[in-house]
Amino acid sequence: SLQNIKADISDVIISSTVPRVVFNLRVLSDRYFNTRPIVVGKPDCKVPIDVRVDAGTAVGPDRIVNSVAGYDLFGGNLIIVDFGTATTFDVVDKDGAYVGGVIAPGVNLSLQALHQMAAALPHVDIARPKEVIGTNTVACMQSGVFWGYIGLVKEICRKIIEEKQEGMKILATGGL
C-alpha cells in the first residue's frame, strides 16, 4: 500500500497536461507522503533548461520534461518526437535551450477522428498493412495512418534539420 512506502518518498514531481490528474496527484502527495509536490509548468517550478519561446506563451510540462531528459542523456542539437495523444516534435539547441517545436494529431487521435467524423468509416487499430494500396476500408485506413505518420515524422524532422542547418539527433518517446 502507499502507506507502506511512505518513508521511502521525500519529494514528488508532477508532470501532466491533464488538470484533474495534477489535482489528484497533489492530493495523494499531500495525504500520503506529507510533501508538497513540485508541479512542472507552474511559476514556482524552475527547470534546468532555458525555454526560448514567444513571451506570454507556455510549453506543456511533458515537453519540458522530455527536453530536460533528452539533453541530459544525449546533449544538444536534438529533436524529441513524442508519440502520444498528440505527436510533438521538440527542439533543443546545441546549448541545451528549448527553442520550440511542432504539434500534430497523434496516431490514435487520427484514427478516432476518421471513425467519429466520417460516418461510414469503422473503428480500426493501428497496424502495419501488408501493402500500401489497401483493398478494403480497414486496410486503406491503416495504410493512410501508418504510412502517413511515417511521412509526417520524416518530413517534419527533415524540415527542422533544414531550418536549423545543423546535424540533429532524433529521439523517439511516448506511448501512442
Please tell me what each predicted stretch does.
Residues 1-79, 94-176:
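Nucleotide/phosphate-binding catalytic cleft detector across ATP-hydrolyzing
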Residues 19, 85-87:
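Short, glycine/acidic-enriched loop or turn micro-motifs at the edges of active sites
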Residues 80, 87-92:
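Short beta-strand scaffold segments in enzyme catalytic cores
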